[in-house]
């Protein structure tokens, strides 16, 4: 499949590991130029960059807290200096909140809102003027299954908020040659932070409820992101792509 992505500039937030890393590698195979960001582990981010460079991609890495509008603006300006602009934005940075609703704190709520909604808001505002000027752009956000079937009020709220945000941008900027879509991954085989669900519990739940009884793979999500960004998907906007092994149907 000819993606038409050669030479495009991709900005991926939360790119140090897991789906972010897999997405970066998928774009590296398409001869794109890549800007990778994370707010914490520069070492892991540099490892992702090195893997992309081995595939022939030109890569730059930056520490960026997506909840800080000034840092986001500086990151996009750095991308302009290095590569001339940003053609594709992948809002992969996320913050998850686990546990019963009444055991969560207001700080948990605000943190989830900041990363999952403020982050895409700031990054989109920073890249859209350049996309409008060039008449071409792709913005890809991350929602999740909880937005559609429940499963944690805080998580469901922010993930459904991403869907609304995506649709609003798609409606407004389609006339400028910009598509905006979101992805709702199911249970993906990733390195999990301490305190999140135990792997064995997740595997049992997936095996019991999912028609394709296994975890999804980060590379499968990365391949979907590349497709959504490609010329082949130029007439698709405002949609949420569910990649969940059939865990639920839309």
Regions found by a protein language model. Name each.
Residues 129, 171-175, 234:
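Alpha-helical segment proximal to the catalytic Tyr-Lys
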Residues 1, 46-50, 175, 182-210, ...:
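A glycine/serine/threonine-rich, flexible loop-to-helix segment
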Residues 32-45:
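Conserved glycine-rich Rossmann-like NAD(P)H-binding loop of the short-chain dehydrogenase/reductase
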Residues 212, 225-226, 237-250:
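Short C-terminal tail/terminal secondary-structure segment
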Residues 16-18:
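Conserved glycine-rich cofactor-binding loop
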Residues 124, 158-159, 166:
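Active-site helix of classical SDR
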């Amino acid at each position: 499949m000819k993606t038409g992505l050669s030479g495009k500039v991709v900005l991926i937030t939360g790119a140090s590991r897991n789906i972010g890393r897999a997405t970066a590698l998928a774009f590296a195979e398409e001869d794109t130029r890549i800007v990778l960001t994370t707010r914490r582990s520069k070492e892991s981010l540099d490892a992702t960059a090195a893997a992309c460079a081995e595939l022939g991609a030109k890569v730059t890495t930056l520490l960026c807290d997506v909840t800080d509008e000034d840092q986001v603006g500086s990151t996009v300006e750095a991308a302009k200096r290095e590569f001339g602009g940003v053609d594709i934005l992948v809002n992969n940075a996320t913050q998850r909140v686990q546990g019963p609703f009444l055991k969560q704190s207001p700080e948990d709520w605000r943190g989830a809102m900041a990363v999952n909604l403020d982050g895409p808001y700031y990054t989109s505002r920073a890249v859209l003027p350049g996309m409008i000027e060039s008449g071409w752009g792709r913005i890809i956000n991350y929602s999740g299954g909880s937005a559609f079937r429940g499963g944690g009020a805080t998580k469901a709220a922010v993930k459904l908020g991403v869907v609304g945000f995506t649709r609003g941008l798609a409606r407004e900027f389609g006339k400028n040659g910009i598509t905006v879509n979101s992805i709702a991954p199911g249970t993906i085989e990733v390195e999990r932070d301490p305190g999140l669900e135990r792997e064995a519990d997740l595997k049992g739940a997936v095996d019991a409820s999912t028609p394709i009884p296994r975890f999804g793979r980060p590379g499968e999500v990365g391949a979907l992101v590349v497709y959504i960004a490609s010329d082949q998907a130029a007439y698709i906007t405002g949609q949420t792509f569910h990649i969940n092994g059939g865990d639920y149907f839309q």
